[in-house]
């Protein structure tokens, strides 16, 4: 494309000295770095980002109401943001997932992991031949048609379902959307396979895109700790950890969640895998309250899985989230038999691994128990983290031996 035919984009001019993160190829521009916008740009529209002297730095999407004023599509000045751009990004991402799916025998995985796959604000999960789309930023929404066209080019047989019904869209002035985009409607419960397990996924009504694919490897790792053990599975959702624990030979697994619908699917998942349902108990309750009740009644477990939802959405909530994580892990530690195993996780991006480890150490002190860290977890390999965007490493976890 020649200079004369190349699209002319509005220019976002940065304040002096605020270009360093872009020079290190971080994909976000925060409001405090912005000097002015030259030209007019609608919500989500493509803009060029330049330093205070006009030197070109990147091309991204404009979001005037967000603290993240721009999200970078490309650091290549010769790259236009069009259907061909999205097709290239999708094919690049698919190469890694194809290899991984063949190696691990997967029929479901994360195809696009936002910024780490060069598509900020875009999440795409594959469940069989269904692609579940979440557009979380203004730029992603603005490019919806181009992205869907690229998806159809890369996988013409896929059925696309939109799950952009997440509250974070409101922060950038967007309505929540959900429904079929192309192809057939997903069934109420779609069976997938994961490490020898069959699991039912609720694409239309489940959490996020229907299932937490990021915990795939952690669910598998659970099996080494549970043989002949009594297991407590907190925040169980649809029972992936419970099924894995039963496949690992546990004596009993108690799954706790506030959603009866999720617990009903968890029960179906146990039955689907022809596992002993008498070893599985399903409790609808608040985890904090139930753990305190178990402590009062002297209940004990050999393994506790603690996989709570995100406790922190922004920095102002971090201190409160730290207290929540400490309290819940303290209660879990108190309920474990000597030598018991705590498998504990945080999916909060603002919670670093070092901080999470310190919280568990503080919880152990408050519980009056010694704890050994014996294994560390992170999101599965279909959720890569690009080196210039450490925020992409949002899921962290530890296996702890409680003395």
From Swiss-Prot:
Its EC number is 2.1.1.191. GO terms for molecular function: RNA binding; rRNA (cytosine) methyltransferase activity. GO terms for cellular component: cytoplasm. Residues 9-88 form the PUA domain. Keywords: Cytoplasm, Methyltransferase, RNA-binding, rRNA processing, S-adenosyl-L-methionine, Transferase. Disulfide bonds: none annotated. It holds the Pfam family PUA_3. It is found in: Cytoplasm. It catalyses: cytidine(1962) in 23S rRNA + S-adenosyl-L-methionine = 5-methylcytidine(1962) in 23S rRNA + S-adenosyl-L-homocysteine + H(+). InterPro entries: PUA, PUA-like_sf, PUA_sf, RLMI, RlmI-like_PUA, SAM-dep_methyl-trfase, SAM-dependent_MTases_sf. Its main location: cytoplasm. Specifically methylates the cytosine at position 1962 (m5C1962) of 23S rRNA. Belongs to the methyltransferase superfamily. RlmI family. This is Ribosomal RNA large subunit methyltransferase I. The gene is rlmI.
């Amino acid at each position: 494309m020649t200079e004369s035919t190349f699209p002319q984009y509005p220019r976002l001019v940065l304040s002096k000295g605020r270009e360093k993160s872009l020079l290190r190829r971080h994909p976000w521009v925060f409001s405090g770095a912005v000097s002015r916008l030259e030209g007019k740009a609608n919500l989500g529209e493509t803009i060029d980002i330049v330093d205070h002297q006009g030197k070109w730095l990147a091309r991204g999407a404009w979001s005037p109401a967000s603290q993240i004023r721009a999200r970078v599509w490309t650091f290549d000045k010769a790259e236009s943001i069009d259907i061909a751009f999205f097709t290239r990004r999708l094919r690049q991402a698919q190469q890694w997932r194809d290899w991984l799916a063949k190696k691990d025998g997967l029929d479901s995985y994360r195809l696009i992991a936002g910024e780490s796959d060069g598509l900020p604000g875009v999440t795409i999960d594959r469940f069989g031949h269904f692609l579940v789309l979440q557009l979380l930023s203004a730029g992603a929404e603005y490019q919806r048609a181009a992205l869907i066209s690229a998806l159809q080019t890369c996988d013409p047989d896929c059925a696309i379902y939109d799950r952009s019904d997440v509250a974070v869209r409101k922060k950038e002035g967007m309505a929540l959307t959900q429904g079929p985009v192309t192809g057939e409607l997903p069934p109420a419960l779609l069976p997938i396979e994961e490490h020898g397990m069959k699991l039912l996924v609720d694409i239309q009504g489940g959490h996020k895109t229907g299932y937490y694919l990021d915990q795939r490897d952690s669910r598998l790792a659970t099996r080494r700790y549970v043989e002949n053990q009594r297991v407590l599975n907190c925040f169980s959702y649809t029972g992936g950890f419970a099924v894995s624990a039963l496949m690992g030979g546990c004596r009993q697994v108690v799954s706790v969640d506030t959603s009866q619908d999720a617990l009903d699917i968890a029960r179906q998942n146990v039955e689907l895998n022809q596992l002993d349902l008498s070893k599985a108990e399903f409790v609808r309750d608040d985890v904090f309250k139930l753990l305190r009740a178990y402590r009062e009644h002297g209940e004990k477990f050999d393994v506790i899985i603690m996989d709570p939802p995100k406790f922190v959405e922004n920095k102002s909530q971090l201190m409160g989230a730290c207290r929540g994580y400490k309290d819940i892990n303290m209660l879990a530690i108190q309920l474990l038999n000597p030598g018991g195993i705590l498998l504990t996780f945080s999916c909060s991006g603002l919670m670093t691994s070092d901080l999470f480890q310190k919280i568990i150490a503080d919880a152990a002190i408050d519980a009056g128990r010694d704890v050994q860290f014996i294994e560390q977890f992170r999101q599965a390999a279909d959720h890569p983290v690009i080196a210039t965007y450490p925020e992409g490493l949002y899921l962290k976890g530890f296996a702890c031996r409680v003395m």
